[in-house]
Amino acid sequence: MSQQLTYSSKINKIRTFALILVFAGIITMYGGILTKNIEWLMVIFFILGTLMVILSCAVYVWIGTLSLRAVPVICPSCEKPTKMLGRVDACMHCKQPLTMDKNLEGIEFDEKYNSRKYKKK
């Protein structure tokens, strides 16, 4: 039984991280409401929750600027427009590995191809 590897695009990974931060911040602040009898603990929960939500906003702004600089391409598998960050990425829709580097065509997909160490080789 062969294992099918599933890749996801970098933009979607970062957006998912920011969304998790929003929900984690809200849940943390809800924990502050549950501990309202212990005032100092409630304040800590609210501050941590607020910082998480603010950090998620910063991540969303950052990924928005990255998304504007990403190269738009048409996926050869699903023929939908997607964006690529780096030398290798995955389609946002069908998870198909993509590359714009002719040297990497036909080679097994690996995210290490985006690292600076690999580019120097």
Swiss-Prot record:
It comes from the Bacteria. Keywords: Cell membrane, Membrane, Transmembrane, Transmembrane helix. The chain crosses the membrane at residues 14-34, 43-63. It is a multi-pass membrane protein. The keyword Transmembrane helix applies. It is found in: Cell membrane. GO terms for cellular component: plasma membrane. The keyword Isomerase does not apply. Belongs to the UPF0295 family. This is UPF0295 protein OB0906.
